Amino acid sequence: MRVIAELPHPDFKISIFSMNQKFIVKIERGILEQSYKISEMDITDGVNSVFELLDEEFLATVTARFKEMGSDFKSAYNRYN
């Protein structure tokens, strides 16, 4: 797996990898991460098409999902302690 690109974002780290004819978009925020696999066959303009997928609407959804994930993890952690 090799790093193709890292995109700046104020709230999280976005990395794009290439592995086995797939692009893997990894988005990290603190201890949490989300990853998305996209077949190279499904997009027409290589990594540039991946950049286009990462629009503001998608990133807003990612932000909301991180909040949900954090809440879920905190609840599980509190049940443990």
Locations of the language-model features?
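N-terminal acidic leader/helix
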Residues: R2-K37
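Short Gly/aromatic-enriched secondary-structure transition segments
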Residues: I38-D42
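Mixed-charge, Lys/Arg-enriched low-complexity segments
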Residues: I43-N81
